[in-house]
Curated annotation (Swiss-Prot):
Sequence similarity: Belongs to the bacterial ribosomal protein bS20 family.
Gene3D superfamilies attached to this UniProt entry: Ribosomal protein S20 (1.20.58.110)
UniProt protein name: Small ribosomal subunit protein bS20
GO process annotations (BP): translation
InterPro entries, per the entry: Ribosomal_bS20 (IPR002583), Ribosomal_bS20_sf (IPR036510)
NCBIfam families registered for this protein in UniProt: S20 (TIGR00029)
Keywords for this protein: Ribonucleoprotein, Ribosomal protein, RNA-binding, rRNA-binding
Keyword Zinc applies: no
Length: 95
């Protein structure tokens, strides 16, 4: 347990920061899940919209050092690949 007043204050500050970071990370994770649900439903407009929001939120998390940049890059890359393959499949069906 902290004995100095400054250490006690830092414990409170860290708890607040942790909660904010959890909310931001959760928001980014939820957009990724919404993208995957739109992919499963086959809704292209919703996929594009949620992809943009997910990408934006992941980049914000990287800038605030909530997640590592390589983790965000990997997730964005995988979502972009899924979006591209979905688009190619739709074009192949149209032909």
């Amino acid at each position: 347990m902290a004995n100095h007043p400054s250490a006690k204050k830092m414990i409170k500050v860290i708890k607040k920061r942790t909660m904010v970071n959890r909310m931001r990370k959760s928001r980014a994770h939820n957009y990724v899940k919404k993208f995957l649900l739109a992919l499963a439903a086959g809704n292209k407009e919703l996929m594009v919209e949620t992809f943009k929001k997910a990408e934006s939120n992941l980049h914000k998390c990287v800038n605030k050092k909530i997640i590592h940049r390589n983790t965000a890059a990997r997730k964005i890359s995988r979502m972009a690949l899924k979006l591209k393959t979905f688009d190619l499949q739709q074009q192949a069906k149209a032909l």
